[in-house]
């Protein structure tokens, strides 16, 4: 009952679709994940699910997360990735180009190294980084 949820999408049509669901204690905002339109220390938690591969500048995303999370707050990041070089090559050179021909706007598949380096530069601590089912990243990051 005391919880408040904020949904963010860069596409106004998706925000309108979300608003029509009339979800209690929720607001929906048009905005960019690489430059969150929120105050500092605004959130206890940020969940980013299946959209990270659309962000051209991952460092800007993690910098926004750091700015908007309260101290001790957590980011839950879920997206596609792999530690398998062949699978990464396939996703980068076959899957993403086909998806983009269909209008998906994918930019890149996240790499473990990129996530770890971006978090470190932003001053965030990676508490957990798992790859499940061969290509599903589950990452928990804390603002220290």
What function would you assign to each model-found segment?
Residues 1-35:
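Class I SAM-dependent methyltransferase SAM/SAH-binding core
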Residues 47:
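A conserved beta-strand element that flanks and buttresses the S-adenosyl-L-methionine
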Residues 50-51:
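Short catalytic micro-motifs in class I SAM-dependent methyltransferases
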Residues 76-122, 127-138:
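C-terminal alpha-helical "lid/dimerization" subdomain adjacent to the S-adenosyl-L-methionine
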Residues 59-71:
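A short glycine-rich, Lys/Arg-flanked "PGG" loop and its adjoining helix->strand segment in the class I
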Residues 139-144:
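C-terminal lobe and adjacent flexible extensions of AdoMet/dcAdoMet transferase-like proteins
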Residues 43-44:
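Local beta-strand N-terminus motif with an aromatic residue
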């Amino acid at each position: 009952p005391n919880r408040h949820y904020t949904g963010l999408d860069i596409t106004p049509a998706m925000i309108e679709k979300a608003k029509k669901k009339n979800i209690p204690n929720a607001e929906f905002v048009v905005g960019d994940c690489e430059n969150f339109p929120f105050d500092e220390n605004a959130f206890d938690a940020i969940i980013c699910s299946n959209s990270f591969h659309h962000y051209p500048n991952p460092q800007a995303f993690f910098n926004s997360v750091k700015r908007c999370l309260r101290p001790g707050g957590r980011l839950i990041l879920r997206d596609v990735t792999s530690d398998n070089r062949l699978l990464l090559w396939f996703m980068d050179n076959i899957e993403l180009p086909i998806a983009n021909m269909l209008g998906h706007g994918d930019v890149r598949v996240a790499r473990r190294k990129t996530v770890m380096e971006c978090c470190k530069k932003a001053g965030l601590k990676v508490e957990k980084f798992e790859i499940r089912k061969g290509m599903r990243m589950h990452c928990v990051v804390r603002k220290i």
